[in-house]
Amino acid sequence: GVGGFHRAHEAAYLDRLMRRRAGSGPGGGAAAAAGGSCLEWGICGVGLLPGDARMRDVLAAQDHLYTLLLKHPGGLRDPAVIGSIHNYLFAPDDPEAVLALLSAPTTRIVSLTVTEGGYNVDDATGMFRTEAPGAVHDAEHPGEPTTAFGYIVEALRRRREAGIPALTVMSCDNLPGNGKVARTAVVSQAAMSDPELADWIDGNVAFPSCMVDRITPRTTRADVAELRRALGVEDAWPVVCEPFTQWVIEDDFPAGRPPWEEVGVQMVDDVVPYELMKLRLLNASHQGLAHWGRLLGMEYAHEAAADEDISSWVRAYLEREARATLRSVPGIDLDDYISTL
């Protein structure tokens, strides 16, 4: 999925890396000399749903470029043109083109941004919903998939038959253990039609978990108009987001990966401590803002954040209660993290 969050997060990180390695960013010359060009990496977006046709049309008209507009406190705007997406395939137009792309040796990572509910996994049981219409269709017609997992399974079947190494499937959705959830979805979809293939996938495909963070509200007409008025930029679908961003990834990429750590991504052995930190500090404080603000008759989050009483309650929760439940998190100063929040 190539929605707002993907374009504000993964695509933005890769764009920064490409610019750095090309010598146009801070330290770019030294980085390029040390590691060579990073322009071998790029993103080809894939849209599966009928509504994704508009993204196809907008990106094609703009040579797959778009504006990322960071909104700072106080109203400062910080725009950047993102160029890491080099193509976009709308699956209903040409399913075979998508399968050919996923099956190609040059494709080494398939990232997923399909929302928390897009994995067809039951929250209560952790089991794949084999009765879902899309799953049933893709099991009965594996060569004509309609779901993300049907496409991935068919592509992996082709790679296996052609002797092409397996790739990495990386979930970038905001749910705990997203790599495990992605593994469940892909392996279970394969098992519905080819148990032997499912075993091969389970043993050969990497499914690293990662923690993602960047508030990215839906782009409005007002955002488009503001960009046009303030900067003279005509962008049919810019992305607006907060300045803060974080990405923590389990370093399990047998087929290779971009050197994301050069642009602030934390590559770790285990993402769980970072997930707990985010859930208990960031997510819980957001929930506190919402509940306390609502009880005090406020309508918007920024009103709650500006209230001195609520701010003191949130800080007390973070420093006195939540922090005590967390062990040390590698590479993170929890006091600094709390201050940032």
Q: Where are the regions a protein language model picked out?
A:
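Substrate/ligand-engaging "lid" and interaction regions
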Residues: G1-L341
